[in-house]
Amino acid sequence: MSLLTEVETYVLSIVPSGPLKAEIAQRLEDVFAGKNTDLEALMEWLKTRPILSPLTKGILGFVFTLTCPSERGLQRRRFVQNALNGNGDPNNMDKAVKLYRKLKREITFHGAKEVALSYSAGALASCMGLIYNRMGTVTTEVAFGLVCATCEQIADSQHRSHRQMVTTTNPLIRHENRMVLASTTAKAMEQMAGSSEQAAEAMEVASQARQMVQAMRTIGTHPSSSAGLKDDLLENLQAYQKRMGVQMQRFK
């Protein structure tokens, strides 16, 4: 796996799924391929994105700044600085300085990532802030190692909370989760369908599913009534894809 592929993988792992994630993935690919070099426009776009947490925006801003060639005097952005200040905790700042000294001695991506993984996400973000504010310099490879370690720490905690939700025995939460997943699957089907004639059937299935979810929410139903709803939808989607000759593993 190339270095930039690895960076893209880690960064996208902390972005919530949805149309915005696809948009960010495209921006990252363009930046890494050297197709998008307008850092100012990129940062303006990032700043106004909804849904993303300030820390995720800060990390993305840091990655864009590392990758885009920019004029020496280009202003640092306040929204990135605020996100990478370790919540203003002096403890985080002390640890960030210690980590920075260790990173100065590293020259490889994996070496830097290994060193950084023993620190908390707050200290890692503060260390990124030091580098972003030009208070310290490390090689781009080492900075990317720091980015990936931070994303891994965040993704780990997100995974724990996601697993808690998936394994919850509370029938109401499970029911709502199935309906939300059915809705998002239906939305994805509608987006994929496009304007081809064969798409009418997929649109119909998706539309029915969304109406069913709406009705269930409006009248209130037994928590087990949504079981199988998403699976039925996915079966329909995969059957439609086969006829269209499309194979999208991502939905499985």
Swiss-Prot record:
Function: Plays critical roles in virus replication, from virus entry and uncoating to assembly and budding of the virus particle. M1 binding to ribonucleocapsids (RNPs) in nucleus seems to inhibit viral transcription. Interaction of viral NEP with M1-RNP is thought to promote nuclear export of the complex, which is targeted to the virion assembly site at the apical plasma membrane in polarized epithelial cells. Interactions with NA and HA may bring M1, a non-raft-associated protein, into lipid rafts. Forms a continuous shell on the inner side of the lipid bilayer in virion, where it binds the RNP.
InterPro entries found in the cross-reference section: Flu_matrix_M1, Flu_matrix_M1_C, Flu_matrix_M1_N, Flu_matrix_M1_N_sub1, Flu_matrix_M1_N_sub2, INFV_M1
Natural source organism: Influenza A virus (strain A/Swine/Wisconsin/1/1961 H1N1)
Gene expressing this chain: M
Membrane topology: Peripheral membrane protein
Gene Ontology MF term list: RNA binding; structural constituent of virion
Pfam families the UniProt entry points to: Flu_M1, Flu_M1_C
Family matches, as Gene3D superfamilies: 1.10.10.180, 1.20.91.10
Keywords: Host nucleus, Membrane, RNA-binding, Viral matrix protein, Virion
Gene Ontology BP annotations: viral budding from plasma membrane
Protein location: Virion membrane; Host nucleus
Protein family (similarity comment): Belongs to the influenza viruses Matrix protein M1 family.
Protein name: Matrix protein 1
CC per GO annotation: host cell nucleus; membrane; virion membrane
Motif (Nuclear localization signal): 101-105
Region entry Membrane-binding, spans: 1-164
Residues covered by region (RNP-binding): 165-252
